[in-house]
Amino acid sequence: MEISVASVTVSVVIAVVTWWVWRTLKWVWFQPKMLESYLRRQGLSGTPYTPLVGDLKRNSKMLTEAISKPIRLNDDITQRVVPYPLQMLKTYGRTHFTWLGPIPAITIMDPELIKEVFNRVYDFQKARLFPLARLIATGLVRYDGDKWAKHRKIINPAFHLEKLKNMVPAFHQCCSEVVGAWDKLVSDKRSSCEVDVWPGLVSMTADMISRTAFGSSYKEGQRIFELQEEIKELLIQSLGKAFIPGYHYLPTKGNRRMKAADREIKVILRGIVNKRLRAREAGEAPSEDLLGILLESNLGQAKGNGMSIEDVMEECKLFYLAGQETTSVLLVWTMVMLSQHQDWQARAREEVKQVFGDKEPNTEGLNQLKVMTMILYEVLRLYPPVTQLPRAIHKEMKLGDMTLPAGVHINLPIMLVQRDTELWGNDAAEFKPERFKDGLSKAAKNQVSFFSFAWGPRICIGQNFALMEAKMAMALILQRFSLELSPSYVHAPYSVITLHPQFGAHLILHKLY
């Protein structure tokens, strides 16, 4: 009996080990090589597969070298921000594949194919390359299928233009506090002063999302921002290990800290949501902020079709992350560009003066700022907050003339497309807001040559929110100051999930009155 039990045990162990080895070999070698062969038979060119790591090491090495030194203002920032994708585009052409570890990713530059990917939301779904990324935020931006459709329907009322009008006073208050602090600095220095505007813009946009999302001040929401920033930094440090099987389960120092920070965020958010629910029951809850509108819309759904408390908390995390990141980077690059291009700064200020004089900006006036809108679109074109969007294929399907197998990813290279001379002309790298004088649809040869906010059914639900914030901030700044680049300004855009200024944004602010 003992021999038979031992034999069975050994047999089971051998079977499990054999199965595990086969699964690992299939994942690391056989599956990628099969997909590579399939893609090459389709006529696609790309990099040869390197087991497990793919192109990650080459990409990381090139990026590390690129961000080790700043560039000149008129240099092409793609060489610094996306050096490896740029080199692959030059080497393999406008449709090619590279490797995200063992996963082939097809980069497409054709706007018609990009449009097809955006429109077929149930076929081309969100890629989930890094399991730990869910700690930053999940919510609407990461959901697919019916869950995405349900959440989009519930959240949509919060970003209706009529609702945004009610948030404009909060935008003004938050902007005024930071602009007022800059004004004091400049006044203390006799009307002219060098300021690193980046920390102030981060604080301003954090305050705006805290007040408009939760009716709370920046100080109450500050801990959430600190924790999300810490998770972002730790996540970026771990990207090189993302394709090690089960890495996100390992109790490394970084993994433990990320999960602890996420738990703390959830405790804070659960407290905010539960407090609001109790206030609603007592008839005392505000309903004009994003959380109030979200809860009201959620309660209006038929039983079983609403969101759980956990779902609401995830959407709150997303409000914080996306609401703060997108607008802060848009504002910092707008201030840098206007400091460099004094003619457009003068035009924008003159428009603000004509619409508002020295009065407080309001919703109606912000909607009349055509020059400012052109400038913001051009900044978004040249400095998109996110440089690329990945999509995943889960079953064989057609895309244009290609037949693509399950297991392949699609890469939509926002920055490369929006600086492409074939689509935007030979002056594609130049700052020319006049491109947008007739709106987005006529700015380039193809409508889907601009997708900083994505496009189609999954277009960013908060784009009007972000643009309204940015217009308010820039109107107040231009009313109060003229801007120029400081001699100490260092041009060094780099991607930390969104496109940050690596060494801040040192500008000279001149007080106008």
Swiss-Prot record:
GO terms for molecular function: heme binding; iron ion binding; oxidoreductase activity, acting on paired donors, with incorporation or reduction of molecular oxygen, reduced flavin or flavoprotein as one donor, and incorporation of one atom of oxygen. Heme binds at C460. The chain crosses the membrane at residues 2-22. It holds the Pfam family p450. It is found in: Membrane. It is a single-pass membrane protein. GO terms for cellular component: membrane. Keywords: Heme, Iron, Membrane, Metal-binding, Monooxygenase, Oxidoreductase, Transmembrane, Transmembrane helix. The keyword Iron applies. Its main location: membrane. GO terms for biological process: saponin metabolic process. Gene3D superfamilies: Cytochrome P450. Its EC number is 1.14.14.-. Coiled coil: none annotated. InterPro entries: Cyt_P450, Cyt_P450_E_grp-I, Cyt_P450_sf, Cytochrome_P450_Monooxygen. The keyword Transcription regulation does not apply. It catalyses: oleanolate + reduced [NADPH--hemoprotein reductase] + O2 = hederagenin + oxidized [NADPH--hemoprotein reductase] + H2O + H(+). Its cofactor is heme. Belongs to the cytochrome P450 family. This is Cytochrome P450 72A552. It comes from Barbarea vulgaris (Yellow rocket). The gene is CYP72A552.
